[in-house]
Amino acid sequence: MAKTLFRGPVLQGKFNEGGVTGFNLEAKEANYTVVNGDSGKTFTSKTKDVVFTLPAISIGRVFTFVNTASDGTNNLTISPNANDGILYAGSLTDDKDIINTQATSKVGDYIVCASLNSTAHWTVVAVQGVFAKES
């Protein structure tokens, strides 16, 4: 019997088909600028080199980004607003990206960014896979 192997979050919800509102999963296959109204959504991407640009900090926002491409085929980039940074793995990267590189990417790799109580940076609150900080 064939085995299905998947690592990553359980994707709950429905994709928005036909412009209906109220859905929390969105597949993006081109660069996308996230807006505060997207808070709570899970964005998926299986296309190489997609960049998700986070909005300016607004406390209480949470966004999830999932690599749904085959292993080793996708770069998934999370980019903060030019005035903000991302706190990840114990250090702050001011106006620098967090990247799930093609060489290390696995299907199901994900990162969750939240604006907890800061007006200066996003915080990575959950991650699976190898995400590198832009130098």
Predicted regions and their residues:
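Acidic, glycine/polar-enriched metal-coordinating patches/loops
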Residues: 45-135
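Short carbohydrate-recognition loop motifs
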Residues: 38-44
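Detector for repetitive beta-architecture
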Residues: 3, 14, 31, 40, ...
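Glycine-rich, low-complexity segments
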Residues: 2-37, 85-88, 124-135
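Short, well-ordered helical secondary-structure segments
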Residues: 21-22, 30, 41, 65, ...
